[in-house]
Amino acid sequence: MRTVTIVGASLAGLYAARELRAQGYDGRLVVVGDEPHPPYDRPPLSKDFLTGRTDEDRLALTDAEESAGLEAEWLLGVRARGLDTQARTVLLADGRTLTTDGLVIATGATARRLPGAPADVHTLRTLEDARALRARLTEGPRRVVVIGGGFIGAETAASCAALGHDVTVLEAAPLPLLPRLGPEMAAVCATLHHRGGVRLRTGTGVTSLRRTGSVTAVELADGHTLTADIVITGIGAVPNTAWLAGSTLTLGDGVLCDEGCATALPQVVAVGDVARAGGTRAEHWTSATEQPRVAVTNLLAGRTLATSRPVPYFWSDQYGSRIQFAGRYRAGDTVRVTEGELLDEGPGEAGFLARYERDGHTVAVLAVDRPRPFTRARRELGRTAATATT
């Protein structure tokens, strides 16, 4: 391959560039990013950056020395608008066309918005999003309504509460994170909200947003109305695949690819939040750093030589606690606390470790403020999973 183009200049795109050079690719390397910034770390946006404990210069994932060493052409602040797979060209929004022999799709995802939501309803996905919300939060005490009790919603609510704002979280399900963690551990997350001084309203949705110039209230399906100065939505993300419409790639909640991140076209792979690898779109920091290794191996080989089905892992920092989860939860799994304790459906002072069991086997582990026991349990889970697939 004479030219490889990476579309997407965030975490997965950067790791793909590193892997290409690490695996010996010495041809032309082009990285296209729709944001004007070099790659930056997104997890702190809802936490330390929002609260002012971290500034923008601490978010950088790379520096000038590494960028020079990668010998890549960085085309930042320009969006890809199309892909011609027959001509092997990437069409850019500024009118330029890039001819490429290999393509890494790493375009990530965009925060999902409420239908018809006005511009002053905040999301938190990009640095621009975080800048805008941080500026609003420094204007003085505000009544904040967070729509969505997932990880982004919970982390954002915790940060707003830490800054002294009056915060309410709305979650349509009976408990936050119920599909991801199951009822026992979802109840723990609910307790963290309560302990953090945040009101949690579950089991109801949003019917409309009341405005008087800007948003002033959130109207709920149960008939109640919440007064709000700031409204934030954390209701998931949509993979950035619109630019691939009309290409020969198969799309469906992401770019469909095998467990080696290879698409049906040998010269195209996908990584990160946009990749639906082996039937799953992982959407986690760890996946974005691990997938590029096998993707690049297969891209350079022109066929799938390497596959990876790691045990899913994610973490979340909220209300001064770190939640870590590894594995695959399924409704009906038995959950046992094996270290530490639960007090009133919340973590004890020293945290806890819980195991999810199915048919006598551990299939997932969750810890709150127990990093070392969790690391051991995660390794054990990984060994078990590897044995099961050999």
Each language-model region and where it sits:
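A Rossmann-like FAD-binding core segment of flavoenzymes
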Residues: 26, 74-83, 87-91, 98, ...
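Mid-to-C-terminal Rossmann-like scaffold of FAD/NAD(P)H-dependent oxidoreductases
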Residues: 2-3, 274-371
